[in-house]
Regions:
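Short glycine-rich loop/turn motifs
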Residues: 225-227, 234, 276-278, 284-285
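Glycine-rich hexapeptide-repeat left-handed beta-helix
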Residues: 25, 265-266, 272, 278-435
Length: 435
């Protein structure tokens, strides 16, 4: 099998979710692009500029370690189990297929590429290219030096038409598109459960209810409480390893509950919800993506929203996902960015990594909350909240760097993750550049 190198074409802007995360790291279904290719045994590595290499290497290693621990018994020789070699940042394999991480490229698409061929979308954006030897090495070197990969001369070649099923995303609201979200979840569920060993496939316990004809995949280590309802009328449900669904919770498919995540008693998890690893979720959520390691464990509504890592939403936090006028939602993803039409009547919020919202926080429709925000004001969060805003009823100021880093280190340690020097440097640089 030809290995895959993932790249970010620089054309995406997920607002605060793009501050610390490349496109291959973003959870777009149950998985990220990097996780998909890792589980398929095809990922040789990722490409990025030299300035981001140390932080990207740290996060990639963390992803590899997490998946290796979850699927350690799966033979790497199988096309959908494990990975034969440890992926790296800016590696130089003899031959590889360069894959644009924001496109939903499948293994069969990669295998169909002939040596030297490329695939572009109707707008000319590079989707994938198969290269080897000196040509491939020159591409990796150029990207490490900061050059945009799609413009590299080695990638200008005849391009066949992209497969009809190929979808892509550029903005947060694209990730919540129902048809594309359903498609990604279905593919991810098939990939994930194919990596489980026979002994890891559990069943819905007798004290819970499975309603609907869709599949429920319960990992043998998942804990399902009394009177839990798993409703697959709208699509399948996956309860991944060591997750916990407490008594009388209702989950409506398609939905994914990630490893070691916790769904509180009486919670309602509505369709098209992807809860990444080590999250705590309660209240009512629907059409949401939690990147991972975030808390919304208490009551409150969160809908049509994307939440980064290391986020805490205090008890009673609620968001609006529909304007009183029922009009199309427009968003400004960053303070300096233009207003953009989302094409959606329902659009809640985008919450950046390391954000903390106090109890009772109200989030208005179409709000973008910047990385590292600490919101403890009684007024609603609305519009665009600048990164590293410290907001109280006395006004807004910037988060103090040392205090922010100390809090981040403490929060990450609660989930046995260390804030290493490269990631700390990335956070401090982002804070220093905040307006």
């Amino acid at each position: 099998m030809i290995p895959v190198l993932l790249f970010d074409d620089g054309l995406t802007d997920l607002g605060p979710l793009s501050d610390l995360r490349a496109s291959w790291e973003q959870r777009t279904g149950a998985l990220s692009a990097a996780e998909r290719w890792l589980l398929a045994g095809r990922l040789a590595g990722v490409l990025c500029a030299q300035g981001r290499q140390a932080a990207e290497a740290q996060r990639l290693a963390r992803t590899v370690a997490a998946l290796a621990g979850q699927h350690a018994a799966t033979p790497p020789s199988q096309p959908q189990g494990g990975h034969a070699a440890v992926p790296a940042v800016n590696p130089r394999p003899h031959e590889a297929v360069l894959v644009n991480a924001r496109f939903d490229v499948r293994a069969e698409d990669v295998d169909a590429l002939h040596p030297g061929s490329s695939v572009r979308d109707p707008q000319g954006v590079l989707i994938a290219a198969r290269r080897s030897g000196a040509e491939l090495a020159s591409v990796v070197t150029a990207v490490a030096a900061g050059s945009p990969l799609p413009e590299h001369t080695a990638l200008r070649a005849a391009t066949p038409a992209p497969p009809a099923h190929t979808t892509s995303w550029q903005r947060p609201w694209h990730l919540l598109d129902a048809a594309a979200f359903d498609q990604r979840l279905a593919r991810d569920f098939e990939l994930l459960t194919s990596c489980w060993q026979p002994s890891e496939h559990g069943t819905v316990p007798s004290w819970a209810t499975h309603a609907g004809r869709g599949a429920v995949h319960v990992h043998a280590t998942a804990q399902v409480g009394a009177n839990v309802v798993l409703d697959t009328t709208g699509g399948p449900i996956v309860l991944d390893r060591e997750c916990t669904v407490r008594h009388q919770a209702v989950i409506m498919g398609p939905a994914y509950i990630g490893p070691r995540s916790w769904i509180s008693e009486h919670s309602l998890v509505k369709a098209r919800s992807s809860i990444g690893p080590q999250c705590k979720v309660g209240g009512e959520v629907g059409s949401v993506i939690f990147q991972g390691c975030s808390n919304k464990v208490h009551d409150g509504h969160l809908g049509d929203a994307l939440v980064g890592e290391w986020v805490n939403l205090g008890a009673g936090t609620v968001n609006s996902n529909l304007l009183n006028t029922y009009a199309e939602v427009v968003m400004r993803l960053r303070p300096s960015a233009p207003l953009e039409r989302t094409g959606r009547q329902f659009m809640g919020c985008v919450v950046g990594d390391h954000t903390k919202l106090a109890i009772g926080t109200r989030i208005m429709t179409g709000t973008s909350i910047g990385t590292g925000t600490m919101w403890a004001a009684s007024t609603p969060a609305s519009g665009t909240v600048r990164a590293f805003t410290w907001a109280t009823d006395d006004g807004e100021r910037q988060y103090q760097a040392d205090k922010f880093v100390a809090t981040a280190r403490l929060v990450m340690a609660r989930r046995h993750v260390t804030l290493d020097a490269p990631e700390e440097a990335q956070l401090r640089a982002l804070l220093a550049a905040a307006p």
